[in-house]
Amino acid sequence: AVLLKDGKVCVAIEKERITRIKHDGGNDSDAIQYCLDAEGIALKDITVVVQCENFTLPKRDFFKGKRLFADSNQPKIIDISHHLAHAYSAVGTSPFSDCNVMVIDGCGSPLDQFIELHPEQKNSIEASFFEINQMQCEKDSFYHFDGQKLTPLIKDFSVMAEQTSSKFQLPTTQHSIGGFYASISNYVFGDMDDVGKLMGLAPF
């Protein structure tokens, strides 16, 4: 969770830092409450929440319990795609006021969910993707940042690949550099989320 005030980061925390469980996910209430407590404010003081709720599935408790603001229509909640969240994270800590952003990911938001979230960006996607009946997810995205807004230039989607039962798993999306990197992580360390460790080996 990250708390912003007037466009500046006030406090940020990964849930795993609180629970001491590596890659801890699901319910985000602990991380949100930490940020509120750090600034001495309450939920009512928040204007808007921006989130990336990937792979929304019916009848599934994705958040593993009631969220901090589950019983209220305040603050306003805005959903954005997985790759757009990555892109804003990059420009938010970048010194550039005008730049291009490239996101290369193992697996981002599904195509149908992306269109539902950002219908105005449909023209950034090649028409042939809409002719494929299989599930497709964000693979590569290219944006332009003008100091205020991120505009998608090109978005590439890929069909989800079948996972194998062998130790060397296929990427989550076909033809994905990010997915391939995660698969190598799984081969070396037995976990597709250990890409940071794999990156740490690079100098050696």
Where would I find each of the regions flagged by the language model?
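Short acidic/glycine-rich loops and adjacent helix/strand connectors
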Residues: 2-204
